[in-house]
Structures are given as structure tokens and as C-alpha cells.
């Protein structure tokens, strides 16, 4: 019983020391970006994200380790499962039927864009 409690305490202590390092690694590998703007030509909108020629909003959550060009000021997002891209085409047609919710793309699908 004492040995089990000792290992449980040791495991908890190691978790306390490992948690900040894991959180720092996760923060380094992820970039969260949100923006509101109007897309400007060629499918590239404000902040340099692939976007449509319509106003809207989007929330990006993407792993930077997948981005070979991550040091460029205009990052090209590869859209994994955790990424969400939502746009509302309110200027072209404000009807609710034109609410566009684009499902996340896999990296393989993004390569063909």
C-alpha cells in the first residue's frame, strides 16, 4: 500500500513538472488567429489567409509544425481537423440560406487548392 502511494505521489509530482513543459510545447506548435475583414481578390483575404471575395469572419486553429513557411509574415494555413473556417456572405445576399460554413479540410485536400 505504501509503495503504491509512493508511486502515485511520484507520478503526481512528475506531472506537475511536466505539465508546464507540455503546455509550452503545445503553445509553440499552435497558432490561434481570428479576423474580420473583406476578402480581396484571388481567394486571399485580410491577414493573408486563403479566403473568398466576400466579407465574413473566421477562426483559425492550426499546428505550426505543419507549416514549412511558418516564418513568413503571411502564413498559409494547412487546415487540419481542429481548424474551423466560417464565412458569412452578408454583403452579396443577406438571406440565412447564404450562411456558408466550410468544413475543415484535410492537409491532402488543401494541397490541391
Swiss-Prot record:
UniProt keywords, alphabetically: Repeat, Secreted, Signal
Lineage top rank: taxon: Eukaryota
Repeat region (Sequence), residues: 32-37, 40-45, 46-49, 50-53, 59-65, 69-75
Positions of region (2 X 6 AA repeats): 32-45
Region (2 X 4 AA approximate tandem repeats): 46-53
Compartments, record wording: Secreted
Signal peptide from the UniProt entry: 1-18
Region 2 X 7 AA approximate repeats, annotated ranges: 59-75
Main location: secreted
GO CC terms of this entry: extracellular region
Record protein name field: Protein USP2
Species this chain originates from: Puccinia graminis (Black stem rust fungus)
Amino acid at each position: 500500500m505504501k509503495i503504491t502511494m509512493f508511486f502515485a505521489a511520484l507520478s503526481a509530482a512528475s506531472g506537475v513538472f511536466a505539465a508546464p513543459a507540455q503546455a509550452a510545447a503545445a503553445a509553440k506548435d499552435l497558432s490561434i488567429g481570428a479576423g474580420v475583414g473583406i476578402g480581396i481578390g484571388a481567394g486571399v483575404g485580410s491577414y493573408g489567409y486563403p479566403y473568398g471575395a466576400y466579407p465574413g469572419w473566421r477562426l483559425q486553429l492550426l499546428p505550426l509544425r505543419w507549416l514549412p513557411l511558418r516564418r513568413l509574415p503571411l502564413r498559409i494555413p494547412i487546415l487540419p481537423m481542429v481548424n474551423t473556417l466560417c464565412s458569412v456572405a452578408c454583403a452579396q445576399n443577406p438571406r440565412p440560406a447564404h450562411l456558408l460554413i466550410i468544413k475543415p479540410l484535410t492537409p491532402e485536400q488543401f494541397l490541391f487548392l
